[in-house]
Amino acid sequence: MYTSPVIGGLLFALVMLFLKITNLATITLDTTLQNLFMTTFFASVGFTASFKILKNGGIKVAMFLGIAILLIISQDIVGATLAKVFQLNPLLGLCTGSISMIGGHGTAGSFGPLLEELGVSGATTVSFASATFGLVMGSFIGGFVAKGLIDNYKLKTPKESHDKSIPLSDFHEDNQAVLCQKRLMKGSAFLFLSMGIGSVISGFIQDTGLTFPSYIGAMIAAAVIRNFCDIRKIEIEEKEIEVIGNISLGYFLCIALMGLKLWELFDLALPLVVMLVAQSLLMAIFAYFITFRAMGKDYDAAVFASASCGFGMGATPNAVANMDALSAKFGFAATPYFVVPIVGALFVDFVNSAVITLFINILM
């Protein structure tokens, strides 16, 4: 259930951990290409956003956002409650809650220093360590949850339906696919065009003072280009764009996971380890019993459940990696591929920041 980049990246992180512990060497990674690969992948996702998919995914966006809000609140309640049980500052519990789980390293870097200013010692370290833990666990939990749902509920998958109109994500295993330089060049051109226009869009967004992921501009531009081409009946090299996007996702995840500082987890005291395990159990139970049922109890819902594990314990790319692993084995689910990045990029950061701020004021 796990993609090769995830396994390879984690193995390299373990090697770095060994070198760190034994003081044999210190490796510093150059992650210059990480954002490029991330932007390329999400631009490819934007090209799937035709009006037809938007129409089908409209209500799903609202539903998935509602589920994400409930998850945010649940994570913060669990974190603060367990902190009180261990006689720790409940604000420190928030560092193992949505600050680091659904917020990831970005939110951890924002709220950690703020909590330290409020007198919570070690908040930044705990936030980053928890986010690192979540990044690792989100990938593992997502696979187990989805496999359990598909097996236990005997869900019908696209590959089982033998419906040739349903695209399969794992294009590189399509034995009938023909590699064509012209189509690859056109697909690359569409991606580069969307990324160029997207950089301008992202610049305008930054000028407003709002905080968005760097890839959102490229994804919006790609969606506009896709729908313009649909209206003008201009052919889009969908398969080639998808392949380039999936390759970029693999490289991005590998680089990101290679840079994990696993030794940061050693600095966590037993109470914090217990809180992180509790967050992992919460995520698995939440995805299995709430996300799956709320999103329709079908194959798409299982993909949503798997994505929510990566999304709820790390970052949107982790969620997409979980979906990609499922799509490669069982078939493509179009709606989750569009809904999850949109919710993760456009809405969750705002809601999460508001909920965290509310909890901070309540617990102070």
Q: Where do the model's predicted regions map?
A:
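Alpha-helical membrane segments and immediately flanking helix-loop junctions
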Residues: 82-126, 133, 145, 298-347
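Entry/N-cap segments of selected transmembrane alpha helices
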Residues: 36-39, 51-80, 188, 258-288
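Structural signature of multi-pass alpha-helical membrane transport proteins
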Residues: 1-31, 47-50, 170-173, 185-240, ...
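Small-residue-rich segments of transmembrane alpha-helices in multi-pass membrane proteins
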Residues: 6-16, 65-77, 98-103, 223, ...
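Transmembrane alpha-helix boundary signature
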Residues: 17-28, 46-57, 77-90, 231-232, ...
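Structural signature of hydrophobic alpha-helical transmembrane segments
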Residues: 28-42, 91-98, 209-221, 244-245, ...
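Intrinsically disordered, low-complexity non-transmembrane regions of multi-pass membrane transporters
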Residues: 147-188, 230-235
